[in-house]
C-alpha cells in the first residue's frame, strides 16, 4: 500500500482552507493556529504510519526534532504516542512546560544536527518546519534517518523558500532577497525579525530536499503538506514547485 493512500483521502480542499484560515491567527491567537496544526500533524503521521505498516500509531515512540512550545507534545500524547521532543531553545522548552501543564511527553535540549540518541532507537522521527531554520538542513535529515529504526518512518516537512510563506513574518518581501527583506522588517518594526535571514532562516528549496531524499535510497513519498490531493503533482514540476509548493513533506523509510 503506498504510504500516502490514507492521507490522500484526508487532503481535501476543505482541509486546505481550514489550515489557511488558521494561519491568520499565528500571531494573534497562537493556540488556535498551533493547536490546529498539531492535530493535523498527528492525523498525517498516523495516516502515513498506517498506510506503510497497517498498524495504528498508538504505542509508538516518536522523536520530534524542534518540538517547540508543546502543542505537538499534547496532541501526540493524547493519541497514545510516546512523545520525545528535541528543542535547542530553552525559551521554547519553558513555554512547553507551561503549555502542557502535565508535561505531556519528554523534552531534551539538543540540536537537531547532533541528536543525542542511539542509532535505530525510535519508531518515527518527525521534523515540522525546522529545516529552513538550520544552516545544514540535510545534516538534520541524516540524523533523523540515523535514529529511526529499520521499518520506521522519518517525516521531514519544511517551508520552501520561494513559496509565499518562505519569508515567514517578513511577508512577501523575501522575493526581493532575504537580507534585504530582513533589513526592511527591521526598519519597519524597530527590531530584527525572529526568523532572521542568514542566522535563523535560510533559503531551502524543494529541489534540494528531493535530491537529498532520493540520494538516501529511503524515499517513500514527497508531497505538498497543505495542498489538496489534486495539486500534489506540482511536486514533480521543476521550477513551478519552488513557488507553488509552500511546504514540502518528505517521507522516508530506512531499511
From Swiss-Prot:
Keywords: Methyltransferase, Transferase. Pfam families: Methyltransf_11. Signal peptide: none annotated. The keyword Transmembrane helix does not apply. GO terms for biological process: methylation. Belongs to the methyltransferase superfamily. PANTHER family: 2-METHOXY-6-POLYPRENYL-1,4-BENZOQUINOL METHYLASE, MITOCHONDRIAL, METHYLTRANSFERASE. This is Uncharacterized methyltransferase Mvan_0241. It comes from Mycolicibacterium vanbaalenii (strain DSM 7251 / JCM 13017 / BCRC 16820 / KCTC 9966 / NRRL B-24157 / PYR-1). The lineage of its organism: Bacteria, Bacillati, Actinomycetota, Actinomycetes, Mycobacteriales.
